[in-house]
Amino acid sequence: VAMGFALTVTYPQAGNIGGGGFMVIKTKDKVTTIDYREKAPAGSTRNMFLNEKGDFLPEKSQVGHLSAGVPGSVAGLLYALEKYGSMTREDVLAQSIRLAEDGFDMEEKLAESLNSNYDLFNKFPSARKVFTKGGLKYTAGEKFVQKDLANTLKLISVHGREGFYSGITAELIVKEMQQ
């Protein structure tokens, strides 16, 4: 669970609180899975990615606000922690909060990944703010600081699921999606 939150900070292209996932857990007595994939929003329709002729429009399902689902990562990771974990939420999230707040030296692979999506990030102000350096490309070795993410992780640390799915974080997500 701690690694899932740490990946949100250090490897956002593979792990993040805006998406979903699944987990296999092995205890002394059994093996189980948790599916916390993102879900389609309530306003979704079966034809939302089709044009007037009924042809599939892949770009609509892959890029932009219509392609987003309701995130499941926070609920799934916290469920795993509550049901199978041995640490407190605060302890599990502490290092991820520190990494996001203080930053870390960006490795070459992360810089390359972010820069490979540079044009796409620049189309969306909220993505540009996080995943570019003031609209410029990142360079390996630069400090990658994510204060807003640190604040969100703090809310999750203190309030659990409600720190993400209710309150200011949820309001900001809804506001962004409605624009």
Regions found by a protein language model. Give the residues of each.
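Noncatalytic scaffold domains of N-terminal-nucleophile
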Residues: 2-179
